[in-house]
Amino acid sequence: MVLVAEDDQEMRSLLCDELYDLGVSIREAADGDEALRSVLDARPSLILTDLRMPAGGLDYIARLRTFAPGVPMVLITSFGDPRTKADALAIGVEAYFDKPVRLSELKGAVRRLLGSALDGEID
């Protein structure tokens, strides 16, 4: 299962549609608090999350990392800069994308991070 955390409904729907094409199951969250509750409820195989959303930010990313150690994390943001990227990578984000994100690159990162899990059903 891939957790998609994005406050913009249109963007979240687009991301989910693209990930469905990879054959993964999806759980959605509209803000950081909902994403954290989701991680506590069911450990995802990967987390794809926006940075700037209600209850978001780098502190939220650090909390996600605490509650989901070892789970690959992909970060997307409209408000990126080199320092934010460096800080995110330092706290354990495996892939970082500025919006507008190139969907082919995003899907490539998801494939790479999920690896062999894409060959079978992802829970």
Regions found by a protein language model. Name each.
Residues 8-27:
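Two-component/phosphorelay signaling modules centered on CheY-like receiver
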Residues 83, 101-114:
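C-terminal output helix
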Residues 111-123:
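The C-terminal output helix
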Residues 59, 80-97:
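Alpha4 helix (beta4-alpha4-beta5 surface) of REC/receiver domains from two-component response regulators
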Residues 37, 58-70:
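Short amphipathic alpha-helix used as the core "switch/output" element in two-component signaling
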